[in-house]
Amino acid sequence: MPMVIHSTSASWGTALKPITNSSSDTITPNPNLITTSRGSSTRPSYITTLTAKKMEQLLPMVINTWNMSEANEMAWRILQQSEGGVRQTRNAVVEGVTRCEELQCFHSVGYGGSPDERGETTLDAMVMDGGLMDVGAVGGLRNIKEAIRVARFVLEHTSHTLLVGQSATDFAVSMGFRTSSLVTPWSHDEWEKWKAKNCQPNCWLNVNPDPKLSCGPYVPKATPLTRWKEDRARNEYEIGENNHDTIGMIAIDVENQIHTGTSTNGMTHKIPGRVGDSPIVGAGSYADNEVGAAVATGDGDVMMRFLPSLLAVEAMRNGKSPQEAAELGIKRIAKYYKDFIGAVIAVNRLGQYAAACYGIPEFPYMISNPTHTVSVQTVKCLPYVHVEPLPKS
């Protein structure tokens, strides 16, 4: 198996310096400025003057989706290997998420969960470097358990962003990873029970025979397509910790170096070949050292259409608070998909964070920083958004 803790190097890019002021406890305004692509600077309206003592309470930090505490604990432990977590953020997200893959968190991460229509489990994962704006990702990875480690190898050993399917497996094998079945007795039993229920629910639309009554095989209907939302509601699928979900993690050191990581085994009973939002840049996660980062979780087929993580980071770039940014990422989706279920966590480069969710009562997430060690926090979800039906064409 390949080495999993890599030595760090200056090639990760020049990190922003810690915000300090030797003459006073009060932070000077300049570090709070965010430089735009044209070189002008604006101070986000939500950032008040922070004291040096307050800054020490925010960074370094690790935050991740859902109540996946052992992943958070592992990442936090790795950040502690250097003062202020410096140069450990990549190791932290990769090994923190790997811990969840090993534990098969809620059967929604790692091997042995979310069987597709053929009973096979496949994995999606991503790592993003917010300094170099570099990404490595895999989608539909077969027969390799360490999905996020393979994504790291894509980042560090190729010029590509995303490798998929059996070819991603072939790449992993060439890099020294070992193959093994991702099917377990539990996942096989779940698949058998699904088939015994006439393959309900499934992901087929506008086909014959009726996918609500049959396992197929299917052929396209000869009639004009109906609007997808009129044909089937998203809430037929129970989305949450146990299905159709992701661990998304953000790590920031005291020099404001940011990495994000994601991993999932995707949607249960998906059509083979389906890739969700987790390995898609701007959907599953996004990071920019100059601004902050965001991760998303939930109904990936819908979420990737809106790039909520990118949307949240760009909102913070334009002066929104982490809370406003996270809510914007959610509300943009709910405007069009009232049955959507999902959540977004947003963190600015100073370590201030917030979460927003929709379609479920509440959303738990994990945080570790100098004042909260492996602490679970919960946010109440946004209320139902009434959407007027679109006029029929």
UniProtKB/Swiss-Prot annotation:
Binding of substrate, residues: R274, V275, G276, D277, T297, G298, D299, G300
GO molecular function (one): peptidase activity
Region (Disordered): 15-41
Enzyme nomenclature, EC number: 3.5.1.26
Pfam families: Asparaginase_2
Active-site annotation: T246 (nucleophile)
Catalysis performed (reactions): N(4)-(beta-N-acetyl-D-glucosaminyl)-L-asparagine + H2O = N-acetyl-beta-D-glucosaminylamine + L-aspartate + H(+)
GO BP: any one term: proteolysis
Record-level GO cellular component terms: lysosome
Biased composition (Polar residues): 19-41
Keyword line: Autocatalytic cleavage, Disulfide bond, Hydrolase, Protease, Signal
Description of post-translational modifications: Cleaved into an alpha and beta chain by autocatalysis; this activates the enzyme. The N-terminal residue of the beta subunit is responsible for the nucleophile hydrolase activity.
Domain of life: Eukaryota
Disulfide-bonded cysteines: C100-C105, C199-C215, C357-C381
Subunit structure: Heterotetramer of two alpha and two beta chains arranged as a dimer of alpha/beta heterodimers.
Family according to the record: Belongs to the Ntn-hydrolase family.
Function: Cleaves the GlcNAc-Asn bond which joins oligosaccharides to the peptide of asparagine-linked glycoproteins.
Protein name from the UniProt record: Putative N(4)-(beta-N-acetylglucosaminyl)-L-asparaginase GH22932
